[in-house]
Amino acid sequence: SNGGENADGFAIKLHSGIGNILENCVADNNSDDGYDCYAAHGAITFKRCQANYNGNCYGIKGDGNGFKLGGVDNKTSGVKPHLDPLNHVLTNCSAKGNTGSGFDRNNQNGVVTMTNCTGDSNKKYNYNWPAKGKPSALGYEVTFGRAKIVNSTSINGKNNISGADLIGKCNG
């Protein structure tokens, strides 16, 4: 058993197709992540999506990120570990009350743009966007492309945004 891992609300991961657009989607109360883009192969567009209270479903616990926006693929048999730099776009999205981070880089090395987004009361960070990653399955520390956080808000939580540029009116 893997606890609550991989019980995501929306799993656009592990070699998913390109051109995925999610609009007006809600991912609430999943034991793992609300939206998981681990090892996706194409940039994903999110419009007006919500991720709330993920990471603990009736005591079954996973990572608990609202939007997990990257990751290295080192688990697929026959596929060499790799990081795909993907330029995901999130517009008018919100993440509230997740046990992990609301918006989590998870080793995404593309330039992700988050516009008019809100992180509220997420346990780890509202925005978790460090400049560098831990040594990965590839065996080296990853230096990332910088995220763009545009006209966005952080409420009742902390942020790790050394790998992001704040543009326009950002609060919190």
Model-predicted regions and their roles:
Residues I18-G19, N52, G102:
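Low-complexity, intrinsically disordered or weakly predicted helical/coil tracts enriched
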Residues S1-H15, N29-Y38, G59-P81, G97-N106, ...:
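Extracellular beta-strand/beta-solenoid scaffold signature
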Residues G19-E23, A43-C49, T76, P85-C93, ...:
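All-beta strand scaffolds that present successive hydrophobic residues in beta-strands
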Residues G55-C57:
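Gram-negative outer-membrane beta-barrel proteins
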Residues C25, Y35, A43, V89, ...:
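A compositionally biased, intrinsically disordered/low-complexity signal enriched
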Residues L14, N24, N29, A39, ...:
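Residues on the solvent-exposed faces and adjacent turns
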